[in-house]
Amino acid sequence: MSPNPSNSLDAFAGEKLAGLEASALRRRLAVTARGPEAAAERGGRSLVSFSCNDYLGLAHDPRVIAAATEALARYGAGAGASRLVTGNSPPLAALEERLARHKGKEAALVFGSGYLANLGIAPALVGAGDLILIDELGHSCLFAGAAMSRAQTVRFAHNDVAQLRTLLAEHRGTARRALILTERVFSMDGDRAPLPEILALAGEYDAWTLVDDAHGLGVVEPGQRAPLEMGTLSKTLGSYGGYLCASQPVIDLLTSRARSLVYTTGLPPASAAAALTALDIVETEPERAARPLALARRFTARLGLPEAMSPIVPVLIGAAEAALALSTALEARGFLVVAIRPPTVAPGTARLRVAFSAAHDEGQVDALAEALIELAPESVRAG
């Protein structure tokens, strides 16, 4: 068969890119130099960033940097092998012990990222003949892990406990095992799952529950713990990596069966050491941990929005083009607030996702609120 130029790889990519461009959905990487105190530089412009998940500003904390530097000098830049070979460094083992204690669990397992953790957990626990029930607004990696498991996967309406009960009643009887997937804090809406009700249903229907705590660790009251508590090291802890906290038998099983752990290089020792020191700070400086939520609530009160439930506040715009235009207008005023568009959020719900940090001050929060009142009065109302 002779080559068809119109069917080339580049032609395919160009056609798809043109479609994304036409619908204002093309993504581009923008070089951003983050600094301390919520500072960022992009395109030669100094900005105040409200688009970072470093909720406590610990990525630039001198104590965290010192811990990483010491581990870097002692253990080298990388782990050098998978954890089951020689990549299980002393900082990793120490971090797992501390994470388990923080979560009130017997053991913990650190992965290369939160995404990798969720790719590995569900397939290690359930498979064909089993059932997964997942909140429709769960993170992409929860859905990816569910798909890889080959279990029957059913979405339930966001935070809808009544529908979850209906689906459990309908499907649980024919499934060997059932796993419920949700988030403590939802990453694009900033709201929280009704965990007491979900955990009660899980008990009633003999189901297991995994809670993704990527955006909640250290910055919201955890409330009731789930049997499976996963999260990241890259947000509140200012480092990089993911983890699962659970019982010792569950962690032992995943050590053998989670493919995203077994077949990848271990986390760099410096990342583990940084996260370990950051966790110490979270536990010993509660006033710092409380600040992001307090600032988020100051912001929502100023704009007359529903009271923030977490450090994440969505400002709903609607059309992707309008969200991009508002983001650009804010950048011209010195604020970095990135537009979130489909498929990350549903069509027609493009937004600015405003993330608050202990590194922000009240003046910066108030200035952003005033800019939004002026630029997008239809999306906010002054309180």
Swiss-Prot record:
The biological processes this protein is annotated with in GO are:
biotin biosynthetic process
Q: What cofactor is needed? A: pyridoxal 5'-phosphate
What domain of life is recorded for the organism?
Bacteria
Instruction: List N6-(pyridoxal phosphate)lysine occurrences by residue.
Output: K235
Residues reported in the UniProt entry to bind substrate: R27, R34, H139, T344
Q: Which UniProt keywords apply?
A: Acyltransferase, Biotin biosynthesis, Pyridoxal phosphate, Transferase
- Please name the InterPro entries in this protein's record: Aminotransferase_I/II_large, AON_synthase_class-II, PyrdxlP-dep_Trfase, PyrdxlP-dep_Trfase_major, PyrdxlP-dep_Trfase_small
The biological pathway it contributes to is: Cofactor biosynthesis; biotin biosynthesis
**A Pfam cross-reference name:** Aminotran_1_2
Supply the EC number(s): 2.3.1.47
| One function term, GO molecular function aspect | pyridoxal phosphate binding
Which chemical reaction does it catalyze? 6-carboxyhexanoyl-[ACP] + L-alanine + H(+) = (8S)-8-amino-7-oxononanoate + holo-[ACP] + CO2
Which annotated residues bind pyridoxal 5'-phosphate?
A: G114, Y115, S187, D212, D213, A214, H215, T232, L233, S234, K235
The record's comment on protein family reads: Belongs to the class-II pyridoxal-phosphate-dependent aminotransferase family. BioF subfamily.
> What function does this protein fulfil?
Catalyzes the decarboxylative condensation of pimeloyl-[acyl-carrier protein] and L-alanine to produce 8-amino-7-oxononanoate (AON), [acyl-carrier protein], and carbon dioxide.
Q: Quaternary form?
A: Homodimer.
Q: What's the name of the protein?
A: 8-amino-7-oxononanoate synthase
Its source organism is: Methylorubrum extorquens (strain PA1) (Methylobacterium extorquens)
